[in-house]
């Protein structure tokens, strides 16, 4: 599970991305293309500017739907006093979000360090829904991934690639042709004299119950090897298909996979919808997709933060979930 630490993920030249887009829709072509992209084996990180000494940590997990508004997202998170933000669906060098490195920008607004890794290399540009002072007509990097921002010092950030249970290259929905697979980003965080492992994860939206359970099982195996005896926090968009509060529903097998290894769901989550209509999403079929689970940690005060800023602007099709860790 090694990941090469870098200051910036290695770019893929535009002409190379065009070659990928022209490849035949075959699994072998995708595998070869992915193996040739250095960024898939890298993790970008920047240290937090200062340590944190406190016994209660406020944590958020937020699918920011490409992160069109990092400044507004940071304002909401600051109001919650958040120390650690587990992030999914974050753009870097994408036309649709003004070519911004949205994780780095969010971290800067919060005064946090950050880590970021590549989930998908996007091969088709999407127009921006807001105006930017940029004449470009293509993605500068085409990076879409997951990561975190942190006020806590952290070490050994790592990428965990998940089982491929759906295809985004051979038959991409909505023209979103991509190279890559779903993944998680984990690191070891320190608060005072205590350490714990935090993990941001995004499970496959097009998977069935068995596919999501297989991805969760692979994630848990990797975290067992990485964390050893340290406590673990997992948070993110699990794309579950059960009713709100349904962490005890045996049909969604991923919950049981984690519970069997000592993870708790009940104290970490409120029962409620975490999706909404947004700039890019119709908001149809609202569900609870976003969850925390913990092992070896005391979690309290779970909450859902609406992804709507002070003037009513919707920042994402997912609300943020929050909890407090008592260390």
Residue ranges and their predicted role:
Residues 69, 73, 102, 106, ...:
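Stable alpha-helical elements in mature extracytoplasmic
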Residues 5, 113-150, 240-315:
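Active site of divalent-metal-dependent phosphoester/diester hydrolases
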């Amino acid at each position: 599970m090694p990941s090469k630490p870098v200051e910036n993920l290695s770019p893929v030249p535009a002409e190379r991305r065009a070659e990928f887009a022209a490849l035949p829709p075959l699994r072998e072509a995708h595998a070869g293309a992915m193996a040739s992209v250095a960024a898939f084996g890298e993790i970008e990180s920047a240290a937090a500017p200062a340590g944190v000494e406190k016994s209660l940590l406020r944590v958020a997990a937020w699918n920011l739907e490409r992160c069109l508004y990092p400044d507004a997202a940071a304002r909401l998170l600051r109001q919650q006093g958040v120390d650690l933000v587990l992030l999914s669906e974050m753009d870097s060098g994408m036309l649709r979000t003004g070519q911004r490195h949205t994780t780095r920008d969010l971290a800067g607004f919060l005064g946090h360090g950050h880590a970021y890794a590549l989930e998908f290399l996007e091969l088709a540009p999407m127009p921006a829904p807001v105006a930017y002072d940029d004449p470009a007509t293509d993605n500068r990097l085409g990076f879409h991934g997951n990561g975190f921002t942190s006020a806590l010092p952290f070490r050994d950030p790592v990428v965990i690639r998940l089982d491929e249970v759906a295809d985004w290259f051979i038959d991409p929905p909505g023209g979103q042709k991509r190279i890559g697979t779903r993944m998680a980003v984990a690191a070891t965080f320190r608060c005072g004299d205590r350490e714990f492992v935090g993990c941001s994860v995004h499970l496959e939206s097009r998977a069935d119950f068995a596919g999501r359970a297989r991805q969760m099982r692979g994630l848990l195996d990797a975290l067992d090897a990485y964390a050893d005896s340290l406590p673990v926090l997992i948070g993110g968009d699990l794309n579950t298909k059960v009713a709100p509060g349904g962490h005890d529903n045996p049909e969604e097998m991923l919950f049981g996979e984690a519970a069997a290894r000592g993870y708790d769901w009940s104290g970490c989550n409120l029962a409620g919808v975490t999706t909404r209509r947004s700039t890019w999403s119709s908001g149809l079929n609202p569900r609870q997709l976003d969850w925390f689970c913990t092992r070896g940690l005391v979690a309290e005060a779970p909450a859902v933060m609406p992804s709507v800023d002070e003037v009513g602007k919707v920042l994402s099709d997912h609300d943020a979930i929050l909890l407090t860790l008592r260390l």
